[in-house]
Amino acid sequence: PLFDPDQMAAAQPKRRRAGTVKKPVIPERDIQRVILQALALHPLVERIERINVMAGRLLGKDGVSASRFMRSCRKGRVDLDGFTTDGRVIAIEVKRPETRNKLTPEQQEYLDQVRRAGGLAGVATCYDEAAAIVEGRI
């Protein structure tokens, strides 16, 4: 034969059983974008912004050697940060619905610190949950 049957079988895409449908997964960044845009219009929100937590090494002048490790902010920082019209801090960690309860210990500690200081903090998987956090209902 021209092609090995075992290799041909391995190269074929995996097929689903008839009648099954793959559940769509909405990326967290899309949920963040929707919440961010909607909260920007909320009457109690003075300012809200997305926080980028980045980490990496600075390269030396030769482009190869790493001179030092840099982090843009500390571990556990929330996804959305801002403040209300009356000056209270807003800290919202955005999660996909299926990973709602999967906070890192650092994220949980940050949310707890904001709450202890009198801020509004919580985990949101949609705009309604984020609005409830801002309005103090959660």
Report each predicted region and the residues it spans.
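Catalytic phosphate/metal-binding cores of nucleic-acid and nucleotide-processing enzymes, i.e., regions
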Residues: P1-I138
